[in-house]
From Swiss-Prot:
It is found in: Nucleus. It comes from Caenorhabditis elegans. Residues 9-83, 123-197 form the RRM domain. The gene is rsp-3. Residues 108-117 have a biased composition (Gly residues). This is Probable splicing factor, arginine/serine-rich 3.
């Protein structure tokens, strides 16, 4: 896409409060440049918005400064709508996060900051049947219809992985986006299959049971040497003290009737 095109000037803003107002979104970004429009999408779960600036450089500044910004108790996500971002020599994006078709899921993106830590939840679906030109950003855009996407990646074989911020969105994605028409940024289309990744540890109401099971062995290992001997000694001491107290009280009770 030519430099300065509309996608270069447009940013996605995720994890907004469901009742956010246009003026509030404008207040977050107004100091970075003149805003052409704000389009808020709300419904199930957190709201999100698209903000278009008049100058692509203002959009770049907004992504750098506001991704991860805390608003109304939430950490919002700000990224380019097509992963365009600032470019270096030869027109290559400075934010590495394009289509990682090397065979493994090793470079998917969850936010707009290049190289930043990715927020992972385990609330994951597997997407199969993606066209060869489908990128992680194409997949992320498609799956946003089901909820707030925090991570997406695409492998060489046309399989994708997507993580949502809520488990309810996983169920909704399987129900509503399975066997839907997917379009890549190059216009290539395919019907995709979407299924829950039950091996991710994020299922069954949020994955709390899986994660608690994974923590419990470590907790037991930490607790056993520290507390078990102390508890056993303290119980033995308490029993011995109770016996000594009972022994000391028994003589005092015997002479009482006179």
């Amino acid at each position: 896409m030519p430099r300065g095109g509309s996608e270069d000037q447009k940013v996605y803003v995720g994890n907004l409060p469901g009742d956010v107002r246009e003026k509030e979104v404008e207040d977050i970004f107004h100091k970075y440049g003149r805003i052409k429009y704000v389009d808020i999408k709300s419904g199930r779960g957190p709201a999100f918005a698209f903000v278009e600036f008049e100058d692509h450089r203002d959009a770049e500044d907004a992504v750098r400064a506001r991704d991860g910004y805390e608003f109304d108790g939430r950490r919002i996500r700000v990224e380019f709508t097509r992963g365009v971002g600032p470019r270096g020599p030869g027109g290559r994006p400075l934010q590495d996060g394009g289509d990682h078709r090397g065979g493994d899921f090793r470079g998917g993106r969850g936010g707009g900051r290049g190289g930043g830590p990715q927020r992972r939840t385990g609330y994951r679906v597997i997407v199969e049947g993606l066209p060869p030109t489908g990128s992680w950003q194409d997949l992320k855009d498609h799956m946003r219809d089901a909820g707030d996407v925090c991570y997406a990646d695409v492998a060489r074989d046309g399989t994708g992985v997507v993580e949502f911020t809520r488990y309810e969105d996983v169920k909704y994605a399987v129900r509503k986006l399975d066997d839907t028409k997917f379009r890549s940024h190059e216009g290539e289309t395919a019907y995709i299959r979407v299924r829950e990744d039950n091996s991710s540890g994020g299922g069954s109401g949020g994955g709390g049971r899986d994660r608690s099971r994974s923590r419990s062995p470590r907790a037991e290992r930490r607790a056993s040497p520290k507390y078990s001997p102390r508890r056993s000694r303290s119980r033995s001491r308490s029993r011995s003290r109770s016996r000594s107290r009972s022994a000391s009280r028994s003589p005092s009770r015997s002479p009482s009737p006179q």
